Amino acid sequence: MSFLKALSFAAVLLVCAGHAVAQITIPAASAIQLAGGKLNLNGADLQISGTLSVGPGLVTNANNISIAAGGLLDAGSGAINLSGNWSDLGSFIAGTSLVNFIDGGSAQAIFAGATTFYTASFSSTTGKNYLFPVGLTQTFTNSLTILGTAAQGIQFRSTAAGQAAFVNLQPSGTQNINFVGVSNVHATGQPLAPTQTNDGGTGDAVGWFGLLAVAVAAVPAPLLSPFGLLLLGLLLMGLARKFRSLSTRCLA
């Protein structure tokens, strides 16, 4: 039996025995290939310290997914569905994959690290909060979908109020965005949701909703030569004398 089959079989046994599977780990130095198959995590966390190659396969019903330092998640042309946190402290190869961030479990999901996705979708009917790390950029090269509802907008926030996180939909990418609130998350690539309004966010949404960053350049004062400074001084002295003269006449 392969390592993946043994791992999945053990998970099934635990579920059938009435025990929740908290986490499935791919150890360091282990390499797993789905080869078009499906890994159903049944709400468990996935910890990747070795290598997981999805290929055209499917990773589904994950809670948290964590790529540890030294770990590799090669998404290939497959799909990954998760409802919890996303941590990328190792390597993520997006390929032409789709990563779906969905409702379930916690009311918020926290990102760690900076990831480049090919296609990513964030959808929530519960107003879920997605928290992105301050100072880091999540990049989307092909397509970005962000969908809340009219009743409860999905929320994009940074992990620290008043400090910005960044998202970058590259120029060739497409977007489908509706009912999203943004707080301290800047769009540094394509302007995002330019015809929408901030649905429940606190602001600092540069690059969203038609709010563009405006660069204000400092204009240095012109430098004067010594002769120019002398003339300026004489002019000021003349103005001062004229002012005193007018003041004396008015008092008289």
Where are these regions (language model features)?
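N-terminal signal peptide c-region/cleavage motif recognized by signal peptidases
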Residues: 15-17
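Cleavable N-terminal signal peptides
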Residues: 9-10, 20
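Cytoplasmic C-terminal tails of single-pass
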Residues: 246-252
